[in-house]
Amino acid sequence: MKRVAKRSFKPVFACLLLPRYDSAGVKIMLKIQLSIRIERPYVGLVSRVWLRQAVKLTLVHTGMSSPVELGLVIAGDDTVHELNRSYRNVDSTTDVIAFALSERGANAEPFITPPDDVIHLGEVIISYPQAKRQAEERCHPLERELALLVAHGVLHLLGYDHELPEQAEKMRAMESRVLDTMKG
């Protein structure tokens, strides 16, 4: 079995407080603990601010109000290919893989919040080279493709899926809402 190349990046942690309003119009703060790791060849090619914004907007548009923690990795094709092969039995690279720490969604067991009240969502891994290829194919900026992939991965962590047409439509609509509100 081929080993995934040793990662040559260090994580950068951010704790974000994002104002939100509940159904009664009361202001609440959404706490997001976000770890962003970028493999060495891609450092400087990706804006951490842009990635954080994509995560925040995705959580806002889904109505998330509980404190959350998640990781985001920008990696190369080799890393993503190996993860895809190891965990999904697909022997090719892909654009984004999400590893949820708990089963979420309509048929999932109720989620028990840990003592720190932070919901540990999981990790999203994006292939920078694949994102770049897709941006070129779709004739839009790489930043837009990265925001789309961040939103897609975070939605998977929250239990969204695209196996059925109605699920895919709901997920695409949510991704579009995120992209429409991205500023840059």
Kindly label every feature range from the protein language model:
Residues 2-147, 155-184:
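An acidic/histidine-cluster motif and surrounding catalytic segment
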